[in-house]
Amino acid sequence: MSTSSILHLVREDLRAFAGYSSARTSALQGDVWLNANESAWGNPADPSASTRRYPDPQPQGLRSALAALYGCAPEQLLIGRGSDEAIDLLVRGLCVPERDAVLVTPPVFGMYAVCARLQNAPLVDVPLVDVPDGFHADIPAIVAAALASNAKLVFLCSPSNPAGSAIALDQIEPALQALQGKALVVVDEAYGEFSEVPSAVGLLARYDNLAVLRTLSKAHALAAARIGTLIANAELIAVLRRCQAPYPVPTPCAAMAEQALSAPALEVTRRRIAEVRSERARVHKALVQLPGVRQVYPSQGNFLLVRFDDAEAAFQALLEAGVVVRDQRAVPRLSDALRITLGTHEQNERVLSALQRTQEAAA
């Protein structure tokens, strides 16, 4: 796809939109900064006075570190307040209300639908297919529905939350080919570090109608810092940056994130990812052997989706043991399911023990 065709997917009224020009976006130099109406003094709670200045809208050190981590150029990357902001920017930037549709694959992360509804964009559901080896995306059905509905955005969550399944790149590629010039395919890789499937970022060199979402909230343990990343065609990134709030990345969060991407920190993160993968296999094996457990879905994430004969009893037993899991029973097609995040070995043992006691009491 050419640059002109990728920009053709952007709302007509935003293609030349200049956005807000903040004081930090100017290239002026000096050592006395009086251009942003900031305080000349630090707050007593901030002895270093480092937070009295507005932050860099896209911190260059962090942007470079994230680009190195994800294997893209810095200009292909937009940092935002979690993946949620990137999802919202994509929907607002590409979808004309009441005209351009957003396609999702339920059961799936709810923010795609929330953002679509806030934009009054038509929502198209192509449910995941529930087969004996887990939930799977029906790519031919997704492509057909996207073309029939004139969808502007197609969200593919891989690994999928809460289903846990990942989409192989050789399945994503036909969707990119079929939807060139018609829709942007957004691959949400929030749980990508836990997956054995390679990142879709490698496909960007061939497909400009691809965007990839990443986050430091999961594997990198920085959920409170709200550091999300959108990776896409550089021209599209530039347009969306102009649609973004002026100062999306607080300075303390950027500094912490940059430290988290240092070599020593990344080594610790890699070890913890390996531990999660090991625990995922162990807990999966233990759960399927418990009476009352109907099905444990294979997972490429840091969680397991589990169906129970009595999900209410299982949920209450875990609460009584002090364990809070995600109740999925209000989600269509998951009325008997709980999503259990993988914790430490000791935390996972607590889950298994509580569920074992429940089944023994019911016997």
Curated annotation (Swiss-Prot):
Tagged with keyword Amino-acid biosynthesis: yes
N6-(pyridoxal phosphate)lysine sites (modified residues): K218
Pfam families hit by this protein: Aminotran_1_2 (PF00155)
Cofactor: pyridoxal 5'-phosphate
Alphabetical list of SUPFAM superfamilies matching this protein: PLP-dependent transferases (SSF53383)
Keyword Disulfide bond: no
Reactions it catalyzes: L-histidinol phosphate + 2-oxoglutarate = 3-(imidazol-4-yl)-2-oxopropyl phosphate + L-glutamate
EC number: 2.6.1.9
GO terms for biological process, alphabetical: L-histidine biosynthetic process
Database matches in CDD domains: AAT_like
Domain of life: Bacteria
The entry's keywords: Amino-acid biosynthesis, Aminotransferase, Histidine biosynthesis, Pyridoxal phosphate, Transferase
MF term (GO), any: pyridoxal phosphate binding
Pathway(s) this gene product operates in, as recorded in its UniProt entry: Amino-acid biosynthesis; L-histidine biosynthesis; L-histidine from 5-phospho-alpha-D-ribose 1-diphosphate: step 7/9
Protein family according to the UniProt entry: Belongs to the class-II pyridoxal-phosphate-dependent aminotransferase family. Histidinol-phosphate aminotransferase subfamily.
Entries under PANTHER family matching the protein: HISTIDINOL-PHOSPHATE AMINOTRANSFERASE (PTHR42885:SF2), HISTIDINOL-PHOSPHATE AMINOTRANSFERASE-RELATED (PTHR42885)
Subunit composition and interactions: Homodimer.
Protein name as annotated: Histidinol-phosphate aminotransferase
Organism per entry: Xanthomonas oryzae pv. oryzae (strain KACC10331 / KXO85)
Name of the gene this protein is made from: hisC
